[in-house]
Amino acid sequence: MKKTGAVLVAAGLSSRMKDFKPMLPFGGSTVSRHMVSMLKDMDIDPIVVVTGYRAEQLESHLSHMSVRFVRNERYRETEMFDSICLGVEAIASDCERIMILPIDIPALMPETIRQTLMIDAPILRTMCKGEPGHPIIIQTDVFPVIWQNDGHRGLRGAMEESGIPITNLEVEDEGIYKD
């Protein structure tokens, strides 16, 4: 199996909720600690958490978990795509492929992560009932082509416009898109 790292995006303002989603309780822990632990249990390494809003609080909260941090200092005026770019840049030289997912989808099932790790494809996207979600896994040698896109349609648009085949993995896990 190819060495897989992960980018956990946590830079957003949590504007749809009043609370800071990465710090919300989940399963005896918090959303962010649960997500990091789940990835570590699958031997995904390195893991970089892209912070922005309330960066110091989240970085302190996860400091004991052996993850890297990258800050999107412009989180108020940039999109998730920009945070993904920062995270990928931080770990691309340390792995062969990168799993990308937001930090706030704790209902994602470990079995879904296991399934994605078994598939070797330039770009792998999870789907549930025909709807795309996370995680997405992209081989590191594909990123230069994806970065040629300006990100105006996010990572999904950049992947679709790259011309690189996308392998869709249908899973029975609505956690791939439930935040």
Roles of regions detected by a PLM:
Residues 26, 70-72, 126, 169:
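Hydrophobic residues at beta-strand termini and immediately following loops
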Residues 9-11, 101-102, 126-127, 170-172:
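Short beta-strand segments
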Residues 33-97, 111:
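Conserved N-terminal catalytic core of the sugar/cofactor nucleotidyltransferase
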Residues 17, 58-62, 116, 146:
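Hydrophobic packing residues within well-ordered alpha-helices of enzyme cores
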Residues 2-51:
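N-terminal glycine-rich phosphate-binding loop and ensuing alpha1 helix
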Residues 22, 68, 122, 165-167:
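Conserved beta-strand segments of alpha/beta enzyme cores
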Residues 76-144:
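Conserved beta-loop-beta/alpha segment of the NTase-like Rossmann-fold superfamily
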